């Protein structure tokens, strides 16, 4: 019953929102990786296909231009992948520590609140036990049973 009123219920909202945002970002990054890798593979295949030697000189110059264009696109896709890796590293280094520290601080605050609640509960139980013991002693010392035993 105490857990429902504690920090665990309130912490699930931001945590769920952060998880949803992280999932969305992960999907976007995976889509970006798929697009870039597909581009690299397609452009490489086109370069290999165009690299066949043909007889007419006009066709060879067109194929050379096509190879240049495909090589340029391949380099752009590879550069995009390198930027993505760099971005992932920066995110892991900077955002990871910040969010981890925030989460740790939040959990420390929640545990401090739970410790305070537990201490108050234990103090109340001690007071109740003390009052009950005094009441039992009072009944014992004033009872007829005690008088007959002494």
UniProtKB/Swiss-Prot annotation:
State the disulfide connectivity.
Answer: none
Entries under InterPro entries matching the protein: Med22
Q: Which residues form a coiled coil?
A: 99-127
* Gene Ontology BP terms: regulation of transcription by RNA polymerase II
Q: Where in the cell is it found?
A: Nucleus
The UniProt entry's sequence similarity note says: Belongs to the Mediator complex subunit 22 family.
The protein depicted here goes by the name Mediator of RNA polymerase II transcription subunit 22a
Q: Which organism is it from?
A: Arabidopsis thaliana
């Amino acid at each position: 019953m105490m857990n429902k009123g504690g920090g665990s219920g309130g912490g699930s909202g931001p945590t769920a929102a952060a998880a949803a945002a992280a999932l969305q970002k992960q999907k976007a990054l995976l889509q970006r990786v798929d697009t870039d890798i597909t581009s690299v593979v397609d452009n490489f295949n086109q370069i290999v296909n165009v690299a066949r030697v043909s007889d007419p000189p006009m066709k060879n110059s067109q194929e050379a231009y096509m190879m240049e264009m495909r090589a340029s696109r391949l380099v752009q896709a590879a550069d995009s992948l390198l930027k993505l890796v760099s971005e992932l590293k920066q995110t892991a280094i900077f955002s990871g520590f910040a969010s981890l520290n925030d989460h740790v601080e939040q959990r420390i605050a929640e545990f401090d609140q739970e410790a305070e609640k537990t201490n108050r509960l234990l103090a109340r139980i001690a007071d109740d036990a003390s009052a009950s013991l005094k009441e039992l002693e009072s009944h014992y010392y004033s009872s007829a049973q005690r008088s007959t035993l002494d």
